[in-house]
Amino acid sequence: MGKVRAFFSRKGRGNSSGRSRSMREAAMNVDWSPRPSDLAAAAAAKPRPPAAEDETERVFRKFDANGDGRISRAELAALFRSVGHAVTDDEVARMMQEADSDGDGYISLGEFAAISAPPPGDAAAAEEDLRHAFGVFDADGNGVITPAELARVLRGIGEAATVAQCRRMIDGVDRNGDGLINFEEFKLMMAAGAGFGRIAS
């Protein structure tokens, strides 16, 4: 779910440099605003391994509710609202305009993959994106992700997640044994590519 964290981390940035870094990090705020140079950099980047491609496609399918191979404005808004993030029609229109590089009014898998790729060498942006993604899961803002908070977000994006399953997922990354995920544990998990994308059985 590294990509989902990307999608939800850009809402409400007031300065253009924050918006220009792209739509990355949905998983979970909103303001994805790639510049053409960001899209070109993502396209020129070395190919991603199959696991990253599979993850990108899996997240894309979460957005593409009707399965037609493209994300519509309504699908984009519905997903964000389903995880409790109010987005205005203007925000959705801006996201669509900035992500839709071919101007057809939809986001294709290729456009989605291009805007999901982090810009090369931008460690500060990556850290900021992780903080925003963490904040989406940490609904009460107390600095840790609980099993219930994790289950809420996963259910919001269409994953059938119980609190018990989320406890097991947390156990896999909980280094201090408190049954919760703090930001440092979250960073390690995302860096390892574990994510929350696969529900424990």
UniProtKB/Swiss-Prot annotation:
Organism: Oryza sativa subsp. japonica
Record-listed Ca(2+) 1 binding positions: D64, N66, D68, R70, E75
Residues engaged in binding Ca(2+) 4: D174, N176, D178, E185
Annotated Ca(2+) 2 binding sites: D100, D102, D104, Y106, E111
Function: Potential calcium sensor.
Binding, Ca(2+) 3: D138, D140, N142, E149
Keyword hit for 4Fe-4S: no
Protein name: Probable calcium-binding protein CML15
Keywords for the protein's UniProt record, in alphabetical order: Calcium, Metal-binding, Repeat
